[in-house]
Amino acid sequence: MNLSATEKDLMIVNMGPHHPSMHGVLRLIVTLDGEDVVDCEPILGYLHRGMEKIAENRTIIQYLPYVTRWDYLATMFTEAITVNGPEQLGNIQVPKRASYIRVIMLELSRIASHLLWLGPFMADIGAQTPFFYIFRERELVYDLFEAATGMRMMHNYFRIGGVAADLPYGWLDKCLDFCDYFLTGIVEYQKLITRNPIFLERVEGIGVIGGEEAINWGLSGPMLRASGIKWDLRKVDHYECYDEFDWEIQWQKEGDSLARYLVRISEMTESIKIIQQALEGIPGGPYENLEIRCFDRERDPEWNDFEYRFISIKPSPTFELPRQELYARMEAPKGELGIFLIGDQSGFPWRWKIRPPGFINLQILPQLVKRMKLADIMTILGSIDIIMGEVDR
């Protein structure tokens, strides 16, 4: 018996929310026509913790332990932007040695973030081996962090006017040894992945973003540079002491998932170049600006009040934010990480707006996956590189 062909029913599929160790608790409601994606709706908010409101009820020093929970795989950057804003508001000079230490820590954190992007990205498209390889190198980075800060993650190392502690004896030599070893590791990754025909089949020409389109969507970081736009805030804004080092902006013009992979792999090599130059040229001197203490509010406790009775308590620094507004930004591993800060002549910010790169970059996902195959969703989502801690805040 012959039946007339009728229009197929569309199928709605839920993807996620997954465990935070992968891309995080992101839920995608995907509408399918067979294997083809018709529509995709991201559902956010599963990891929302009210980070902006918490900032309005804490001093900057009290808030520092919270910020490491935004992007919990690149915590040095969230700490850096948290102290950079008040430093610019108060016109506080950072000692040269502290600036060099900051650059070293930021670039090590960039390498660790890119490594933990590479492993799950390869696992998403079916390659399990690199997922285990990247932990080998990442463990060495975390050993360096632990030796310098006491913590493998959530370091709480940056301070207004410098860093919390100087580098321990022998740390610079240990870091130089890591740089030499890691360059051979990147060569191994490129042999294993970059020219792999199965890998190229999965990523080449998938999720293409043009240069003008990337600018219109407000993309930043490797997402923008993979579309042919040479834009890196380390070169544009001249923050810390990046101008003193010889390095190049890494970019590609194809705009597909392969281009985003190549940009991040190349950025790790550039980070090693920056770290090596910083280690060889790091000056002596103080690691913090002691003049920051003059910003502390004078205490004149009355008899029988809390501060008088508990005279032995260690006071928290009360850096007062002047009545101004400021937007501070920096080049995080995932893109432009910024804060919009409004001071109100008190120790607490009146407004603390976070501009997370992952949240902005994620907005283009529904457009990229339309008319693609279902299996390509994980390739495109993985190439964007999101952490839901900073997306939901």
Curated annotation (Swiss-Prot):
Species of the source: Gossypium barbadense
Localisation per UniProt entry: Plastid, Chloroplast thylakoid membrane
Gene it is expressed from: ndhH
InterPro entries from the UniProt entry: NADH_Q_OxRdtase_suD (IPR001135), NADH_UbQ_OxRdtase_49kDa_CS (IPR014029), NDH1_su_D/H (IPR022885), NiFe-Hase_large (IPR029014)
One Gene Ontology biological process: photosynthesis, light reaction
Role played: NDH shuttles electrons from NAD(P)H:plastoquinone, via FMN and iron-sulfur (Fe-S) centers, to quinones in the photosynthetic chain and possibly in a chloroplast respiratory chain. The immediate electron acceptor for the enzyme in this species is believed to be plastoquinone. Couples the redox reaction to proton translocation, and thus conserves the redox energy in a proton gradient.
Ranges in coiled-coil conformation: none
Keywords: Chloroplast, Membrane, NAD, NADP, Plastid, Plastoquinone, Quinone, Thylakoid, Translocase, Transport
Complex formation: NDH is composed of at least 16 different subunits, 5 of which are encoded in the nucleus.
PROSITE patterns attached to this UniProt entry: COMPLEX1_49K
GO molecular function: NAD binding; oxidoreductase activity, acting on NAD(P)H, quinone or similar compound as acceptor; quinone binding
EC number: 7.1.1.-
Listed Gene3D superfamilies: Cytochrome-c3 Hydrogenase, chain B (1.10.645.10)
Lineage of source species: Eukaryota, Viridiplantae, Streptophyta, Embryophyta, Tracheophyta
A cellular-component GO term for this protein: chloroplast thylakoid membrane
Catalytic activity: a plastoquinone + NADH + (n+1) H(+)(in) = a plastoquinol + NAD(+) + n H(+)(out); a plastoquinone + NADPH + (n+1) H(+)(in) = a plastoquinol + NADP(+) + n H(+)(out)
Top-level enzyme category: translocase
PANTHER family listed in its UniProt record: NADH DEHYDROGENASE [UBIQUINONE] IRON-SULFUR PROTEIN 2, MITOCHONDRIAL, NADH-UBIQUINONE OXIDOREDUCTASE 49 KDA SUBUNIT
Top-level division of the source organism's lineage: Eukaryota
NAD as UniProt keyword: yes
Protein name, per record: NAD(P)H-quinone oxidoreductase subunit H, chloroplastic
Main location: plastid
Family membership noted in the UniProt record: Belongs to the complex I 49 kDa subunit family.
UniProt topology in membrane: Peripheral membrane protein
